Regions:
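Ordered hydrophobic segments in well-structured contexts
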Residues: 4, 12-24, 122-128, 137-144, ...
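Mixed-charge, glycine-accented linear interaction segment located at domain edges/termini
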Residues: 140-198
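Generic "edge-of-domain/loop-turn" microfeature
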Residues: 52-54, 89, 132-134, 150, ...
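Short, surface-exposed, polar/charged, turn-prone segments marking secondary-structure boundaries
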Residues: 75-77, 108-113, 171-176
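Solvent-exposed edge beta-strands and adjacent loop segments
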Residues: 1-92, 147-165
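Short helix-loop boundary/capping segments
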Residues: 90-145
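Beta-strand secondary-structure signal
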Residues: 79-83, 122-126, 167-171
Length: 198
């Protein structure tokens, strides 16, 4: 059938597998450091960048809804959510949001009633992309969230003969230092063939 088809290069443009949450990532080198992995997830990760608009023409006579010249972008809510199944004291601190790790006891996470600059963090999600996924030249799709804060709170659900699960939601935040900068960016890089000896 004429219109029951898919692009011939579909496999070259698929995002594959669950990906990783990272504390840091350089898209220029695409080097993965094990110490940057935040933890193991279950069920993948969901990222959303949801814009909020105002239609200034909605109360104007004879103006149809969604007139593009009268539409204005108010803000963009940027979130990442999922479920972690591994925990360290530092990860729990980040999930609590406003909290510290006790410097005298690095196993002790102490919640606070106020926010500090240290509660906001940059977070990367990076997943395999394209049909070329070798160790050196593999493609990737990467999302960088800036000034992310845990807004979903800290939760732990345990179950008999199962792994404990910690649901999370992170929200990226604008900054007064750069109020026009939307607090996320996306990189889409196709992989290339692995060369012998490269």
């Amino acid at each position: 059938m004429k219109f029951t088809q898919i692009p011939s290069d579909t496999f070259s443009h698929l995002q594959l597998n669950a990906g990783l949450m990272l504390r840091d990532f350089d898209p220029k080198t695409a080097t993965l450091k094990g110490t940057d992995i935040m933890g193991a997830t279950s069920g993948g990760v969901e990222f959303k960048a949801k814009p909020s608009y105002t239609d200034f023409g909605e109360d104007i006579d004879n103006c149809p809804a969604n007139m593009k010249e009268l539409k204005r972008l108010d803000s963009i809510e940027v979130t990442m959510s999922g479920t972690l199944v591994t925990a360290t004291a530092e990860v729990v601190r980040q999930l609590v949001g406003a909290a510290d790790v006790d410097p005298k006891d690095l196993t002790h996470v102490v919640p606070r009633n106020d926010l500090t600059e240290a509660d906001f963090m940059d977070v990367w999600w990076v997943g395999d992309y394209s049909d070329k996924n070798g160790d050196k030249n593999g493609g990737f799709l990467a999302i960088h969230m800036e000034n992310a804060l845990s807004t979903g709170g800290f939760s732990l659900k345990s179950d008999n003969k199962k792994k404990g699960q910690m649901d999370f939601e992170l929200t990226a935040h604008y900054s007064m230092d750069a109020p026009d900068r939307v607090p996320y960016e996306v990189y889409v890089k196709a992989g290339t063939d692995e060369k012998a000896g490269a």
